[in-house]
Amino acid sequence: DYFDPKLKTEGIKLNISNWRRPAPNTIPWDSKAAGLYMICTLSKHEAERQGYSESLMLDHEGNVAESTSANIFFKDEKGEFHTPIADSFLNGITRQTVIEIAKSMNIVVHERKIKPEELSTFVGCFLTGTAAEITPVSQIAENKYKVCDRILNLSESYGKLVRKKKAA
């Protein structure tokens, strides 16, 4: 597992990186091999030095982008999900799959620009990625989130789908 399995139910903690993702016109951002690993590695190591598991990356405009290794989603009080528009980071296969699963569960998904100031308005948060699968987030900087049933149910649905594909 990418994160400690215990954290899959408790949630991980993220800081907010001082480094930003570069502007889309400066690097081929929609590829894993685009050379962005250095910024993400520096950010993750700094987060770990501060006692966090991960780091939230902002884009070149200061909007929420993703973590150093996974895409990010937020849950609002109505139970709807919000995720940044994939215009400066890789639109991961896990992210796309989670959006499809959420919609099949009648969960509204908003793909939009998310300002860091909005982090305090959300009640839930989770990361998605090949290694992370669906990992709940309990805190970003001073903002705390609940690991709720909606996120755990989504994680269970994703796990069933992945295991079914692996068995086929």
Residues of each region from the PLM?
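Helix-start/capping segments and mature chain N-termini
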Residues: 1-168
